[in-house]
Amino acid sequence: MQQATAPKISFVSLGCPKALVDSERIITRLRAEGYELARKHDGADLVIVNTCGFLDSAKQESLAAIGEAMATNGKVIVTGCMGAEPEQIEAAYPGVLSITGPQQYESVLEAVHRARPALHNPHLDLVPPQGVRLTPRHYAYLKISEGCNNRCSFCIIPKLRGDLVSRPAGDVLREAEKLVAAGVKELLVISQDTSAYGVDVKYAESPWKDRAVRAKFLDLASELGELGAWVRLHYVYPYPHVDEVIGLMADGKVLPYLDIPFQHASPDVLKLMKRPAAQDKTLDRIKRWREQCPDLALRSTFIVGFPGETERDFEFLLEWLDEAEIDRLGAFKYEPVAGAPSNALPDQIADEVKQERWNRLMARQQAISARRLKRKVGTRQQVIIDEIGPTVAKGRSKADAPDIDGAVYLSSRRPLRVGEIVTAKIDRADAYDLHGTVAGF
């Protein structure tokens, strides 16, 4: 008798690293139950689309992905942030099998079971102990909480993902330990508000090895720094207690890197945005951080053309950037999001003004980036290898997160391996990237 084949699932993951972690969790459960992953929609038994609903452009991308899955397969399960408001999906594609919001893993699995039951009962040893990941083997995203307590006027994340829910520190550390044991060299700590970690549970302790660890930003970062991997901190709001973690960076416990979404510098615009920690002494703090940890790299995102942003506000931002010298910057032109309070603000900015300001901001940042990278020429930097090319290898320094920051291009007389961390001599720099040779050869 011919043995039945395992059902195959095609998976599309859209949006931010938090959504990617959600996708990894769903896939890990499916693999544990005997489902296989298909590379293409046609030939798969089902397609799961994990959507993004943060911006209208992201919603359009999600709808396009659903449409492609419906056209090439026809059996589609939708989950993720856009699924929290299913009306638009239902109107465009009434034939989808199921629609669920973010973090609703059990509902997704139930929908899969209804549409295509597994062949046998789950056995957890069918998957590796670290689970199934969608990133390269040498780095992994480590999500420490869900949701957000902030109510920024341009954001609907709390509406989609709820208020802050922190994971117990012991659970986070056990996951991190498994990842490192499986060969992960870099842990990228993510959440909606990493520096607020533990506020919702009043920094409750949980067991970890032979001791109790508080669910607190500093405590967790300190423990992660003992696992022997690079630890990179993302989505950190500039609350006063962030100052405490700079010492860990100066001591080499965690990477000297902070991803802080400042969004703007003008006090008036920050007030309209309803940003937390919107204080006017941020420049002083950045100066103190760099005095304590000279190698500190700062990444941030900014919004230009926010309703009410005047030319004076924008010039303030440019002058602030000149003084702050942010190492890595992402900029977005303000885009109305359905359900966001900022839609009702007066003095909306014309699209051509948004574009003009975005161009000026990026030109200013390009000069800042080139200036800061030039200072690294002649120095030695640790570099983690991401790709091996025919003539050079592509990697990242401690100042570069994957996908969003710059790269280091290296020549080497010996073969290099993906995931290897090497010491490189920096020979030259351009606006966003470094070029060098592996030291010692």
Swiss-Prot record:
Residues 374-440 form the TRAM domain. Keywords: 4Fe-4S, Cytoplasm, Iron, Iron-sulfur, Metal-binding, S-adenosyl-L-methionine, Transferase. The keyword Cytoplasm applies. GO terms for molecular function: 4 iron, 4 sulfur cluster binding; aspartic acid methylthiotransferase activity; metal ion binding; protein methylthiotransferase activity. Residues 7-117 form the MTTase N-terminal domain. [4Fe-4S] cluster 1 binds at C16, C52, C81. Its EC number is 2.8.4.4. Residues 134-371 form the Radical SAM core domain. It is an enzyme of class 2 (transferase). It holds the Pfam family UPF0004. It is found in: Cytoplasm. SUPFAM superfamilies: Radical SAM enzymes (SSF102114). One of its GO terms (biological process) is tRNA modification. Binds 2 [4Fe-4S] clusters. One cluster is coordinated with 3 cysteines and an exchangeable S-adenosyl-L-methionine. GO terms for cellular component: cytosol. It catalyses: L-aspartate(89)-[ribosomal protein uS12]-hydrogen + (sulfur carrier)-SH + AH2 + 2 S-adenosyl-L-methionine = 3-methylsulfanyl-L-aspartate(89)-[ribosomal protein uS12]-hydrogen + (sulfur carrier)-H + 5'-deoxyadenosine + L-methionine + A + S-adenosyl-L-homocysteine + 2 H(+). Its cofactor is [4Fe-4S] cluster. Gene3D superfamilies: Methylthiotransferase, N-terminal domain, Nucleic acid-binding proteins, tm_1862 like domain. It comes from the Bacteria. Its main location: cytoplasm. Belongs to the methylthiotransferase family. RimO subfamily. Catalyzes the methylthiolation of an aspartic acid residue of ribosomal protein uS12. PANTHER family: RIBOSOMAL PROTEIN S12 METHYLTHIOTRANSFERASE RIMO, RIBOSOMAL PROTEIN US12 METHYLTHIOTRANSFERASE RIMO. NCBIfam families: 30S ribosomal protein S12 methylthiotransferase RimO (TIGR01125), MiaB/RimO family radical SAM methylthiotransferase (TIGR00089). This is Ribosomal protein uS12 methylthiotransferase RimO. It comes from Rhodopseudomonas palustris (strain ATCC BAA-98 / CGA009).
